[in-house]
UniProtKB/Swiss-Prot annotation:
It comes from Homo sapiens. Residues 1-34, 85-198 are annotated as: Disordered. GO terms for molecular function: cyclin binding; cyclin-dependent protein kinase activating kinase regulator activity; cyclin-dependent protein serine/threonine kinase inhibitor activity; molecular adaptor activity; molecular function inhibitor activity; protein kinase binding; protein kinase inhibitor activity; protein phosphatase binding. This is Cyclin-dependent kinase inhibitor 1B. Residues 51-91 are annotated as: Interaction with CDK2. A peptide sequence containing only AA 28-79 retains substantial Kip1 cyclin A/CDK2 inhibitory activity. The gene is CDKN1B. Induction: Maximal levels in quiescence cells and early G(1). Levels decrease after mitogen stimulation as cells progress toward S-phase.
Length: 198
């Protein structure tokens, strides 16, 4: 440290150490509007939620809390599940980070073992409305993580002769006496007509 030079414009190291000890720098995360009253915040949120619920109840004459229709301008009717479009009762999409298990294949992409069904996905599409939404999310997350570990995005090909999109061959390789030298087509190049710009 004896070779370190401090410029005249900067404060000396002793002064900086003393300043830091006397007045610690306040944290960057400051409360600009005073302390937060959590009870008041909770009351305001509950009041806002009640107001929204009452407004939607008046608008749609439906009690969303008890799942019952109310008297009003709309007439609610109970319908059979089969008469509804499929997107009303199909299972929800898995989260973006979750892996996808192919539905029509009975084995995984490497062909070694049967693919396990998705955690939380119902076995029968008819029973999707009966799925218990109170499953433990930590269990399903670990199950998905274990499931996704061995599955590849792109399946392994059995054909060992993979071909590049563009054949990167030079004229020397084409003029070789190799048996597959003429099998790759080459795009003819335009003769170079370059003009000088002045």
């Amino acid at each position: 440290m004896s070779n370190v030079r401090v410029s005249n414009g900067s404060p000396s190291l002793e002064r900086m150490d003393a300043r830091q000890a006397e007045h610690p720098k306040p944290s960057a995360c400051r409360n600009l509007f005073g302390p937060v009253d959590h009870e008041e915040l909770t009351r305001d949120l509950e009041k806002h939620c009640r107001d929204m619920e009452e407004a939607s109840q008046r608008k749609w004459n439906f009690d969303f809390q008890n799942h019952k229709p109310l008297e009003g301008k709309y007439e609610w009717q109970e319908v059979e599940k089969g008469s509804l479009p499929e997107f009303y009762y199909r299972p929800p999409r898995p989260p973006k980070g979750a892996c996808k298990v192919p539905a029509q294949e009975s084995q995984d992409v490497s062909g070694s073992r049967p693919a396990a069904p998705l955690i939380g996905a119902p076995a029968n599409s008819e029973d999707t409305h009966l799925v218990d939404p109170k499953t433990d999310p930590s269990d399903s997350q670990t199950g998905l993580a274990e499931q996704c570990a061995g599955i590849r995005k792109r399946p392994a090909t059995d054909d060992s002769s993979t071909q590049n999109k563009r054949a990167n061959r030079t004229e020397e390789n084409v003029s070789d006496g190799s048996p597959n030298a003429g099998s790759v087509e080459q795009t003819p190049k335009k003769p170079g007509l370059r003009r000088r710009q002045t």
